[in-house]
Amino acid sequence: MKSKVVLLLTLLAAAAVVHGQHDPHFWPGHSTIVHLFEWKFSDIALECERFLGPRGFGGIQLSPVNEYVIVQRGANRPWWERYQPVSFKIISRSGNEQDFLDMSRRCNAVGVRLYVDIIINHMAAHPGDSGDGVGVGVGGSTAIPRDRYFPAVPFGDADFNPSCQITDWGNAVQVRDCELLGLPDLNQAVGNVRDRSVDFLNHLIDLGVAGFRVDAAKHMWPGDMEVIFGRLKNLDPSFGFAPGSRAFMMQEVIDNGPHEAIRKYEYTHLGTVTEFMYSFYVGRAFVGNDALIWLQTLGVDWGLLPSRDALVFVDNHDNQRDHGSGGQGGNILTHKAPRPYKMATAFAAAFPFGQLRIMSSFFFDDSDQGPPEDANNNIISPSINPDGSCGNGWVCEHRWRQITNMINFRNVCWGTPMTNWFSSGQNKIAFGRGSCGFVAFNNEPGQDMLEVVQTGLPAGVYCDVISGEKVGSACTGKSISVLADGRASISIARDAEDGVVAIHIESRL
């Protein structure tokens, strides 16, 4: 009997870990993760306090925070140098450990959680710029990648898989045990690799993070990851987490369909998984290469993960540079096409599927270009313009009115079902979220949308949160009147600045 009790307790503990790794630990009234790509810790802390917390954002994906090799590429250092680690010390162009802790305290205090992009699949391949094969990290640590010598961890040759290149993406063993883009491939079955990885992640938990984005999860064996994740501490209650909370996991698994040797489903027991096909399907529709009407059934029937397991996004830092898009870059929407991008993001925020993450980018002319920097390679802080947008080379999609207000829509209507689906032709659609919210889209070339549709909302005059917002009892954009029976006349001109309107119960005037 005693052995049965022990087994039951073990199974219950394992189930709690798995369930916990799907929970992002948002504050009530908050949702959505924003990737503040390449931001400094001091700027992130300020953005939490002045914008993200008050506006109801749930959390932030941080760029890698541990030490990486310095790569000098002309006048600009590439963004991808962060993905070439030389140690697990918390030091980067974003700041040091004290800067990180200050950011963590300030963001958690206003209800914004932090998720660190972690690299435990590999170490740096770039030999640095000295010509002697010795790479120098941003914190001064040195490494000799060609010899697999990383003394600041420490890692040596015995901690890596035998050197081989991925030449056959249809071979799952090769994809997991050989070198991704020549990066020395750590062997997560080795005790030292597991110990150092666990120590690194536990230290970040001590510093107040809510979870992790696991880079290159596809290139690691799920069984090894399960061992590492199972050894992590519970989240620290001093940062506002409930006792017993487990770290949220976002695992990067690029799965572009059944032809893949490694499938996303192999990782769902460990947490959420990046759903790249969601990005493709939504982008293809709003680019105009597919009809909006088909999006009504977007989900598992399309080959997507179940909603609980899916981390969904319109774009991410890779596929906006045509990396990991499976040759479908033309169907990936980014800030460079603002009108359809805002429409696609509004759809993703309103459609009740998956855990949503949005991008906050910097402008770039080529795919290697790093963040805005000064003559000494210091990252330049975003400036905030009078209209709330960003300057100094930063896009800040999360501050675009249409996107910010749709995150609020998502928060207000959290947990309500999709109702009252409407379509006219191929590319005019609308749907409600119970008696809470309503959105409509017109992506029909050369045609206006003028329809009387059922919103599901109580009677009243509502402020369209796409064209403006409610200020007191007034609306800075256009207003929409809902009749006693829930119907409303919806008008979206073919050449409207935004091809979408949205109203919700809190935008009633």
Which ranges hold each PLM region?
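Classical eukaryotic N-terminal signal peptides for Sec-dependent ER targeting/secretion
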Residues: 1-9
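Active-site-proximal helices and loops of the catalytic beta/alpha 8
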Residues: 13-32, 47-53, 57, 64-85, ...
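Boundary/entry segment of secreted carbohydrate-active catalytic domains
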Residues: 20-41, 181-185
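Alpha-helical scaffold elements lining the catalytic groove of polysaccharide deacetylases
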Residues: 188-200
